[in-house]
Amino acid sequence: MSFDTHIATEANDIVLIRHFDAPRALVFMAWIDPVMLAEWWGPEGFTATVEADVREGGEMSLTMYSPEGEAYPIGGHFGEIVPNEILVMIMDASRHSAGWHEAIKAGFVDAGGRPEDYNADPIETRVTFEDEGGGTKVTVRQTFTMATMRDAHLKLGSGVGWSGSFNKLDAVLAKTR
């Protein structure tokens, strides 16, 4: 069964909430197992490679590939990890292409930001996992340094990308159960 993704904004955050028809331990595993994560990370039509040392302070490297073959590398590290409950990732997209950064910067300016204030600061992504109705409620909270950066990411399709990723995660969970 597929569910909708609820997307909201709060302060400098994008908040995404999605129910998955799978046990919490399995959903959490899909976020920390590099093989499973590579199967669903990125918008629909994208593929991914993942390397992850899943421990607090451990490094992570994810690269999404568009259907046209453009690479979107993301580096970072893990923050707080509470098995089956909380996963925090500090994600750095500074290695994305110049074209991607120009698009984000344009969205940042359109959202009211001054060009000289644009930055590619890392984004804290906090994921919580809760039992809900025989499945799992996942809440993803991405915290940006400024609301204008949040709005720029939404304008470039962050919400649509996450929804597509979650659709792919549904499929991974269905075949794993």
Show the residue positions of the predicted features.
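Short coil/turn motifs at secondary-structure junctions
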Residues: 23, 81-83, 94-96, 132-134, ...
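A short acidic/glycine-rich loop-to-helix N-cap element
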Residues: 101-107, 113-118, 143-164
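Short, P/G- and charge-enriched loop/turn segments at secondary-structure junctions
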Residues: 3-4, 109-117, 126-127
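Hydrophobic/aromatic beta-strand elements that line small-molecule binding cavities or substrate pockets
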Residues: 18, 49-50, 74-80, 122-131
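Short, highly charged C-terminal tails/helix-capping segments
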Residues: 173-177
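Glycine-rich portal/gate segments that line the openings of hydrophobic small-molecule binding cavities
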Residues: 49-110
